[in-house]
Every structure is written in structure tokens, then in C-alpha cells.
Amino acid sequence: MSSQTNTLTEGPLAKQIFLVSLPLALSNLLQVLFNMSDVAVVGRFAGSTALGAVGSTSTLVTLFTGFLIGLSNGINVLVARFYGARHPKDVEKTVHSAAIISAVAGVVLLLIGLLGSPAMLRLLNTKEDLLPGAILYLRVYFLGMPALALYNFGNAVFSSIGDTKKPLMYLSIAGALNIALNLFFVIVCNLSVVGVALASAISQCVSAFLILRALTRVQDCYALDPHKLQLDPAQAKSILALGVPAGLQNAIFAIANLFIQAGVNSFDSLMVKGNSAAANADGLIYDCMAAFYMACASFMSQNYGAGRPDRVKKSYFISLGYSFGVGLVLGAALFFCGPAFLALFTTEAAVIDAGMKRVSVMAFAYGISAFMDCTIAASRGLGKTVVPTVIVVLGSCVFRVIWVYTIFAHFHTIPALYLLYPCSWILTALAEIAYFASCYKRAMAIFRKPAAA
């Protein structure tokens, strides 16, 4: 096996976590920019109706892509565990089983998106003037879903062994292509929402091709060999046991957010458009923080597999500190630069004013989510996924739905709607931390030497 294992199991943790997380954060940002460039281009060159149409799909896009990201988190943890423990055969079986599972998941989600887009958008109470464009955007965008699934698979494998630079490089190429195609399809071809969706789908295919090609050229046990593609029952079960709860958590979050989107849609079209523009900040800030969550799971899993309990707990606290700091700093920057940020997506002053109502509530709340999400990642790094998912479903998702139908229904204001985010994050974080403390104590018991007789 390669000496690259030392990237995660040796050396100063604070420095190593930062160096691994930085390319991950940039990769996450580029993925967000895929959709942001769609919104910016249609808002600038296709009008506010097209902007609202694309923005109305954001929750559904998050639902499906969130499931794939959760699945890839399971792949990341399992490969890291076996790689840290120096079990090359298990790494090989996991990689090839994961490739098959990811491809199948991408195709299934593609079919669901193509067939179910109209019904799901109507369920969200999407405005009638926005509905045709939103349906077109979703159906074309989902053509790239299998490619997105395979890219996330490749990203998870490389990240699990500490190589986060390759995914960043490939996504940079695809991101530049995405922006160029957006401008070409919308300005030159006048394709509006179809053009930006097509640009995203093509770019996702390019990033998937590049990362899969790189995996086939690796000289290590995590290499992808098309001739070895076979579903190993034991590894497939482990991947699904880790990845499906994480994927369902992301999907359930998105489902809960559907109710929030329905609440936004209960206001006039101006507020819907302002919310669509302001919501782009969520992806930028949250995904920068999420890089440290993936690093946390990778470092904890590899060090746990390598028998380094001293580094396991430190990985959690360092990752938590980084993610909280990033959320706080970026949230403050958004608050003070909000109008300029919103102007990237619309030139209408009224839409910018509407968007600032959301920004004023959310800007200083992002950092709170680090205590919830980093703790969930830490539990997954120890192989625990079911209970953290149940806690999230109850503490955040169910709580949010109840909030929408009680607190928001009573006050019916934008602040009353968006205050549910920090409140649900605090509630869930407390429960997740209590569970992690318990399972950490049990997991570390295997490293304690028995007392002398």
C-alpha cells in the first residue's frame, strides 16, 4: 500500500486536517457554483421569471444530490477504515462495489427526476408562471445525475486516503466549462433555463469522466479496474449500512425544507425571487464548513482503523473548531456584503431588499450548525449512522415541520420562518453530542489494556 496513509495517521493534526479540508472546501464551492452560475446567468440575461423558475427547483435538487452525497460519505468512511488498517483486499472490494452502487443510484434518481418533476413542483406550490420553466430545468438537469453519482464516488475514494487535490482539479475544469456553456447557451443560443441546465449536465459528465479515468490509473489498492467490477455482498451491505442513513438524512432534510419552501411560496413572487437569490449563500457557506466534516470522518475512521485512539478525539475537536470558525466568518461577511452578493443574481432593487430579509436572519446562524454536523460526521467515522440519522430526523426535520405549522402559521413573517434553522440546529446538536460521547467511550474501550492480575 502507498505511504500516503501517513497523510491521515501521522503528523500534526491541525495542519493535516486543514491541508486536506482546503481542497475539499474548494471542490464543494465549485459544485455550488454549478447551480449558482445557472441562477446568475438566467437572472442577468433571461429575466426574473427564469430566475424564479431555477430558484424554485433548488430544494428538489438538494434532495436528490443530498442523497448521493450521503451515499458517498459512507464510501469514504469504509475505504478510509480499511486503508488505515492496511487491508488492501477489502479496499479493492469496497471500491468496485461502491462504483456499481453509485451508478445504479444515479440512474434511479434520474428516472425519478424525469418522471416526477411536475408532481413534486406542484407539491411545493410553485407559482404557475414559474412552473413550465422549473419543469424544463429539472428534467434537463437530471440528465447529469448518473455522472454526479459517479463523480461523488470518485471524490469519496480519493478523499478517504487524503488526496483531495485531484477532485479539485477535475472539478475546476468542469466548473470553468459550466460557466462558459451557461453564457453560450443563454446569450448566444437563447435557451434560457434549458441552456443552463444542459450546461450543468454536460459539466457533470466531464468531471465524472476525469475522476474515473484517474482512478483507473492509480497504482494502489484503491484503483478502479473495469475488469474487477463486481458487487461483493459483504462490502455492499457495509456501504449501504453507512451510506443510506447518511443519504436519507440529507434527503429528509430536503423534504423538511420542502415545507419551508412552501412557506416561502405563500408570499408574493417578489419574496420568492429574493429568497431564491439569497439561498445561494447557504450552499457557499455550508459547503465550506462541510469540507471539515468529511475530513473529520476520514481522519477519525483511518486513525480508528490504524489503532491510533489518541488522534481520534483530537480529529473531532480540531474539525469542529475549523468548521465553526468558517461559518462565523463567512456569515459575518455575508451580513455586511449582502446587497452586493444579491446583486450577482438580480438587478432589481426590490428583489435585493426581499433577499436581505433572509440574509439578516441566517447570516450569524450558520456557525451553530457546525456543532450538529461535525458531531454527526464524528459518529459516522466510528461507524455509527442509524442513531445520528434518527436524531436528525426528530430534532431537525420533524421539528421544522411542526414549526412551520405552528410558529410560522401564527406569525406568517420571514423572520418567523427562518428562525427555525438555528433553533433546530441547537436542539439537534445537544442530542448528537450526548450520543457521540456515549459511543466514543464504547469505541475506545477496545484500545484499553486489561488490568494486570
Regions found by a protein language model. Give the residues of each.
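Short alpha-helical transmembrane segments in multi-pass integral membrane proteins
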Residues: M1-S21, V79-P146, V188-V244, M300-A365, ...
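N-terminal transmembrane alpha-helices
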Residues: L8-F45, T59-G74, L78, A103-L110, ...
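Transmembrane helical elements of multi-pass membrane transporters/channels
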Residues: L19-D38, V140, Y151, A174, ...
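Helix-terminus/linker motif at the lipid-water interface of multi-pass membrane proteins
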Residues: L33-G52, L121-E128, F184-L191, A251-L284, ...
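Small-residue hotspots at the loop-to-helix junctions and early N-terminal turns
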Residues: A46-T59, A134, L138, A197, ...
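Small-residue-rich hydrophobic transmembrane alpha-helices
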Residues: L51-L111, L148-P167, Q261, G274-G338, ...
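Hydrophobic transmembrane alpha-helices of multi-pass small-molecule transporters
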Residues: L63-G66, N178-N182, A208-L212, L284-D287, ...
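Short runs within selected transmembrane alpha-helices of multi-pass transporters and secretion channels
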Residues: S72, Y141-S159, P167-G175, V196-I211, ...
